[in-house]
């Protein structure tokens, strides 16, 4: 259940838990600049996988913040929970 959606113009007014603040800020910048991001993502079923994603939107739902993104590994749109992103790197590639 989505409780909020990222709006680039209101980024400064968003409160984010300290544990995911860096991840949130990198994703917000990537969304604004249409840049790809490299993440290590933890899945309960598959453990950690490394993925390149094209992030489109940040959203708040019942269990926390998420990002809607195109996953280059799965070739599909996916939702990723920010609390499950272990490592993140902003790339110099655009989408």
Regions picked out by a protein language model, each given a short descriptive name:
Residues 1-95:
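Short glycine- and basic-residue-enriched patches
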């Amino acid at each position: 259940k989505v409780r909020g959606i990222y709006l680039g113009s209101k980024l400064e007014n968003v409160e984010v838990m300290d544990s995911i603040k860096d991840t949130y800020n990198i994703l917000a910048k990537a969304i604004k600049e249409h840049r790809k991001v490299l993440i290590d993502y933890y899945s309960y079923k598959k453990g950690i996988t490394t993925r390149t994603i094209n992030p489109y939107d940040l959203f708040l739902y019942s269990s926390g913040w998420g990002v809607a993104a195109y996953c280059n590994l799965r070739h599909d749109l996916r939702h990723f929970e920010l609390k499950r992103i272990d490592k993140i790197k902003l790339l110099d590639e655009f989408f």
